[in-house]
């Protein structure tokens, strides 16, 4: 936190998730409700990195909940994607943008190139993804392929986090390529989140609850949490008590 900003502690969201342990959760909330901040918080808490990220949580509520919850900190490889800037008028531009996003995320896991758990075929897949040298079919398998390699390398299945999952879909609806983008996203999400033994948990956030039949078809393990649900409601936006407290601080 900075002296120029207020930080509202939402880390008890992590405790609720660990207690409930849903496999895949979709959070839908309006704009400016803290979706991206919460997805980043989940990433920072769970992700296994060279940096000691526990320092960001030592003075937060989750840390006072005990060792059971601390043991989850920094223990998982994480695949993190955000589609918030995928705002284009054509499918071709949208595909290129999604391909670049997946390429950059793949590059963040360069340890796979030298992993003893990955063979030459895995390394070729990695290089193709990292360089963007893939067609639609291969790109739609990116989450499945990357999670498979990470699982074998670390011996722990990764967590997949996708922020603003619905931005490309909204653009498709407005610009006449809805069916194309929905078909692609369905294959991408299914490969990464449906019956995938190489994923521990999945988190998605967005504004819209796109019909489950259209994009999450067959994803029986999906739990949808919307603005109408009481559970997790205190972790998005500000509660009345938080608003009053910040006003007093001001």
Give residue ranges: language-model regions.
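Substrate-engagement module of ASCE P-loop NTPases
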Residues: 106, 142-152, 180-200
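Conserved P-loop NTPase "ATPase switch" module shared by AAA+ and STAND
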Residues: 154-178
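Conserved P-loop NTPase mechanochemical-coupling segment
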Residues: 80, 86-140, 168-175
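Structural recognition of the conserved hydrophobic beta-strand(s) that form the central parallel beta-sheet
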Residues: 159-163, 187, 200-207
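Short regulatory helix/loop adjacent to the ATP-binding pocket of P-loop NTPases
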Residues: 197-199, 210-228
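P-loop NTPase motor core
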Residues: 9, 15, 44-111, 237
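Conserved small/polar residues in nucleotide/adenosyl-binding loops
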Residues: 245-250
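Walker A/P-loop nucleotide-binding motif
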Residues: 23-41
């Amino acid at each position: 936190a900075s002296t120029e900003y207020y930080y509202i502690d939402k880390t008890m969201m992590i405790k609720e998730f660990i207690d409930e342990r849903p496999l895949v959760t979709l959070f839908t909330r309006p704009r400016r409700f803290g979706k991206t901040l919460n997805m980043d918080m989940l990433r920072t808490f769970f992700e296994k990195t060279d940096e000691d990220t526990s320092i960001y949580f030592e003075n937060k509520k989750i840390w006072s909940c005990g060792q059971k919850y601390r043991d989850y900190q920094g223990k998982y490889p994480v695949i993190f994607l955000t589609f918030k800037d995928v705002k284009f008028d054509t499918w071709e531009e949208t595909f290129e943008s999604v391909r670049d996003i997946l390429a950059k995320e793949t590059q963040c896991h360069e340890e796979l190139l030298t992993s003893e758990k990955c063979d030459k075929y895995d390394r070729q897949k990695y290089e193709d993804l990292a360089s963007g040298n893939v067609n639609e079919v291969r790109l739609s398998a990116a989450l499945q392929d990357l999670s498979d390699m990470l699982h074998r390398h670390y011996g722990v299945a990764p967590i997949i986090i996708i922020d603003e999952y619905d931005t490309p879909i909204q653009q498709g609806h407005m610009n006449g390529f809805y069916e194309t983008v929905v078909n692609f996203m369905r294959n991408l999400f299914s490969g990464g989140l449906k019956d995938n033994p190489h994923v521990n948990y999945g988190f998605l956030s967005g504004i819209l609850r796109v019909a489950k039949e259209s994009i999450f078809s067959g994803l029986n393990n999906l739990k949808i949490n919307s603005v109408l649900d009481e559970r997790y409601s205190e972790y998005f936006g500000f509660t009345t008590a938080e608003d009053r407290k910040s006003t007093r601080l001001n």
